[in-house]
Each structure stands twice: as structure tokens, then as C-alpha cells.
Amino acid sequence: MHAYRTHNCAALSKKNVGETVRLSGWVHNKRDHGGVLFVDLRDHYGITQIVADEDSAALPVLDKLKLESVVTIDGDVKARDAEAVNPNLPTGEIEVFARSVEIQSRAEELPLIVNSAEDYPEDVRLKYRFVDLRRERLHRNIMLRSQVITSIRNRMTAQGFTEFQTPILAASSPEGARDYIVPSRLHPGTFYALPQAPQMFKQLLMVAGFDRYFQIAPCFRDEDLRADRSPEFYQLDFEMSFVTQEDVFQAIEPVLAGVFEEFANGKSVTKSGEFPRIPYAEAMLKYGTDKPDLRNPLVISDVTDHFQSSGFGLFEKIVGIGGRVRVIPAPNTQEKSRKFFDDMNDWARKEGFAGLGYVTRKQGEFGGPIAKNHGPENMQKIYDELGLGENDGLFFAAGKEKDAAKLAGAARTRVGEELGLIEQGCFKFCWIVDFPMFEYDEELKKIDFSHNPFSMPQGEMEALENKDPLEILAWQYDIVCNGYELSSGAIRNHKPEIMYKAFEIAGYDRETVDREFSGMIEAFKLGAPPHGGSAPGIDRIVMLLADEPNIREVIAFPLNQKAQDLMMGAPSQVPPKALRDVHIRTVEPPKKQQVGTHLVNDDS
């Protein structure tokens, strides 16, 4: 017999009745029924019920053990009585009568209870993550992550992609988020950077003549954390040679749709080949965001024209200085009280906006300050244009175009949630396409890149030389699912002269481009194919499939929201010698002192 087990804790069934078996695992739960002790023995695979009565040598040992102690049990498999069968367990038709028990490890007082769904503070869960990972939900999430990655690998290989590995110690890049830097011992005063993405390397693989690359790539970004962000994360990084934007879509849609269908647990998924293509400008108008949740049926409309010379002072003033007025319908709100609408306005102000105007309507009668100021006839024109009914309310977001779009987008989400309009049980994908190549930076008073500076502009050199930069679109695209951006990608700018021209428009001279991006530019001067790709985030994919609120619930050992590893104590100080070896010293940041109601740096 094996030293620890003949079967795992999910393997036994009625066909094993009469056998003598050996099981090992954690003491998940105990129930004392007056001289008979029932123990749920748990391992990675499942749970088996162990029975120890007064005739069993295992009874006094098991009785004294604390939960989560690790034991090896020898015993006989017996069928449960009909009334004792547990249909929720694979082993629910049998139980093992313990003959003997060997203690492998005694558990002390537990910081959190494994067999309970009780919630615990995140700092406790992260400090004792190895215990938290024993809990069913989190254990299941990590297994789901493994299965998703395996499925992705198989599907990418089937699509003709080859898996590569790219360097972890790389050069620092001037664009994007902050780098995590690593000092060099052999080259004093110089630093490596952990890659924010394998962007340069994967493009250079295309220049090297490989055709379809992918990897499950670790990425590192020193940025502020959110529920859907982590300083270290993984992405399905891929790149393809001699492709158009449509070729990229056709390659990755079957992978994403297939993975989601495989693990959706009954939820519907947008079919491959049917991902809607939504231009960026349309997304910002209709949804107020470039990450639209298409489960929400509400659509934003622009009614600016209705308030030009309208006599409604506030909106007329906003429109007069180039602002926009956007509206969000609130269907069938005739039974909602005035408080519902006022609460939405209060919510907008708490979110940092100036406020959210509204119109109420019940059986055709308009209500609210905007309807009063704009007049029922003018309001009816808006309702007719938008196809709204006699019991539909309307919320108004007004201001500079970006501000109005942002408020309208947030309000669309809020109204959809408050009215229960968000469709459940589905994953709705879309592509956001036709991003602007450039934007005007109000703070710097100059034109700069809108998103990815290395995207190919639509129209290439002709567009750069002849069009208004703010009208030039890029071959850039995002994949969005249920309001989450899963990936950004682009057809790359592989032509040095077009790249120089694009950077020139954004205010960078040729010398700066050569200095900052020498590796890429020099490679492109030696023969580069047209190429493009993307990089869907693994953590966000698993988060959606697991129906979790943040990505820390699908990462085995995540950092907390302060980028700390509470379990291992990272980041930590290192011995002075370790700093001397890499030729660096630490300088404490200036302490902040309270002066009146403000914190100021103490630079003395």
C-alpha cells in the first residue's frame, strides 16, 4: 500500500465498498454524535466522510485534533444508509470506517475558518493566503485559471501560433506606466527594467521572420492599483506578420469566444465572427466610454442642438462656449419618486461632477426643473426625436464634450443598475476601433499621441502630411467584454519614415526618436513586415469567468492595494552590503508636516 494514499478524497464510490483504503488530507470538519465521530477529510480533489466509533483506535486521536490538521487514515469502505446519502458529494454514497490514523501535521489556532463561507478582512486573507487558498471558492478560482490558460494555449497552437519566451530583464521604456527597475551589479549606475509588456521583443520576432507568436507573458507596471489592476499580471501576448486589422480579429475571436464558451457555466457568449465593431467616436457618444457594457440597453444621445438659442440659460451658456448636452433615458420610471432623481443628482456630485439634471414623466406629463425651464413643447420634440415614451424619465449631462461624455457614461451605468436593466447570464464582446491617432493636450497646449504612438495611422504618410492631425485615425483596437477592457492592440507602424513623421507631429525630433527607440527603429531599417497583434489580460478573463469582483480573487499570491505582499513581507529592506554590491543607496523622501489644513513637504 502507498505510504500516503491509495485513492484521493473524491475517488471512492459504491464500487469500492468492502475495500481497505488509505486516504490523506486535511481535517475539514468534525461532528460528534455521541460515541461516533464523523470527520470530513479533504484534499485537493474533494471530501470523503470518515467514521470513527468506540471500537476504532482512531477515535481518541481524531477527537483531539484541531481542524486543518493533516492526517493519513486507513479504513474500510462501507455504503451509507439511504437516508445518509449526500448527493452533493462525488463520494456521497460511501463512508470510510477508520481503523487507524497517523498524524502528519498538527494545526494550531486558525486565523480564518476554512470550512466556512464567512468573509474576512483582506489583510488577514492575504497574510495567510496559503490557508485562504484551501477554501473552496478560491481553490476553485485558481484551478479555473489553470484550465483557462491550458485552453488558451491549445487554441492558439491550433490557430498556427508558436509559443516563445521573451526576456524579463529588459531596458527601461520611456512610454507607458512607471517601470519596476533592477540595478545592475556588473554595470554600476545602470538599471534593467521588468517589462511592462513584451512589446518590443514580439515585434522584433516578426522582424526576425517568425510569423505567429504568442506567450502567456508576465508583465509589471508600477502604477496605482484598482479592482481590475495589479502591479504584476499576465496576458495572452500575440503578434502576427503580414496581417490587416481584420486578420487579427479573425485569429483571436475564436480563441476568446471558445474559452468563454468552455468555461461560461451556462452563460451565453457572443459568437466568434459576431463581435460588434464600434468606432471610438460612436462609443463615446452612445455609451460615454470606450469600454461599453453592452448588457446595458441604455443608449446616450446628444441633444445639444435643442438648446441653442433655447432660452434655457444654463444649457444655452454651455452650448455657446462649445459644450455638449447628452441625455440618458430612464425608461418606465413613472412610479419612481422625486427622491430617486434627486439621489442620482447627489450621486453625480459625490463622484466629482457638477450635477445631473433630470426630467420626470408620468402619463405624458413632464416634471422637474429642466422641463419647467425648457417648456413642454420643446421637451416633446426631444422625446419624439429619441423615441421615448410617456412614462420615461431623462437625465442630462452638460459640459465640455469629454466631461459630458464621462458623466453620461457613468450615469448610464448607474441608471441601468438602479433600474435592474443589466442583462444577466451573458458575456457580450465588442471591438472598439478607429481610435484617434492624436489628441490635443490641454495642459501642455500641444498635440500628442492619443493612445499608442507605434500604431499605423490610417492613410499612412499621406494622412500625416495632408490631414488635420486631430482627424487622423489609427489602426488601433480594444477588446471589451461586459464593460471591461480585456486588451488593446494595433497594426504596428513598421515604416521608419512614417514613424518619424508621426513623432514629429507630436513634437519629437528625429534625434529623440533615435535615442529613445533605437532598437526598434534600427530593426525596421533592415526589413520589417507589416504586423499587428494584441494582448488580452489573463487575470481579467478569469475574473469575469469566475464572477469575481476583483482580480486578486483569481491570483494565487496577489499583492494588496498598496503593492505589498503581506505573507512574505515584500517589499522589504535589504542589508547594506546588498545595496553596496549594486552601487546604490536609499534616500528617504521628505517628511510631510501639517500646516493649517494642508500637508507640505519638509525639505529642510
From Swiss-Prot:
Signal peptide location: none
List positions binding L-aspartate: E175, R221, H451, R492
| Annotated binding of ATP, by residue | R221, D222, E223, E485, G537, I538, D539, R540
| Source organism, top-level taxon | Bacteria
Q: Which GO terms describe its molecular function?
A: aspartate-tRNA ligase activity; aspartate-tRNA(Asn) ligase activity; ATP binding; nucleic acid binding
UniProt cross-references to PROSITE patterns, sorted A to Z: AA_TRNA_LIGASE_II (PS50862)
Give residue numbers for the site Important for tRNA non-discrimination. Answer: H33
Name where it's found: Cytoplasm
Recorded hits in Pfam families, A to Z, give: GAD, tRNA-synt_2, tRNA_anti-codon
GO BP, one annotated term: aspartyl-tRNA aminoacylation
Q: Among its keywords, does the record have Aminoacyl-tRNA synthetase?
A: yes
User: Where are the annotated segments for Aspartate?
Assistant: 199-202
Work out whether the entry's keyword set contains Ligase.
yes
Can you supply one Gene Ontology CC term for this chain's record?
cytoplasm
Q: Which keywords does the record carry?
A: Aminoacyl-tRNA synthetase, ATP-binding, Cytoplasm, Ligase, Nucleotide-binding, Protein biosynthesis
Enzyme nomenclature, EC number: 6.1.1.23
Stored InterPro entries:
Aa-tRNA-synt_II, aa-tRNA-synth_II, aa-tRNA-synth_II/BPL/LPL, Asp-tRNA-ligase_1, Asp-tRNA-ligase_1_N, Asp/Asn-tRNA-synth_IIb, AspRS_core, GAD-like_sf
So what does this thing catalyse? tRNA(Asx) + L-aspartate + ATP = L-aspartyl-tRNA(Asx) + AMP + diphosphate
Assembly and binders: Homodimer.
Listed HAMAP family:
Asp_tRNA_synth_type1
For this chain, the family text in UniProt reads: Belongs to the class-II aminoacyl-tRNA synthetase family. Type 1 subfamily.
State what this protein does: Aspartyl-tRNA synthetase with relaxed tRNA specificity since it is able to aspartylate not only its cognate tRNA(Asp) but also tRNA(Asn). Reaction proceeds in two steps: L-aspartate is first activated by ATP to form Asp-AMP and then transferred to the acceptor end of tRNA(Asp/Asn).
Q: What is this protein called?
A: Aspartate--tRNA(Asp/Asn) ligase
- To which species is this protein native? Erythrobacter litoralis (strain HTCC2594)
**Encoding gene (name):** aspS
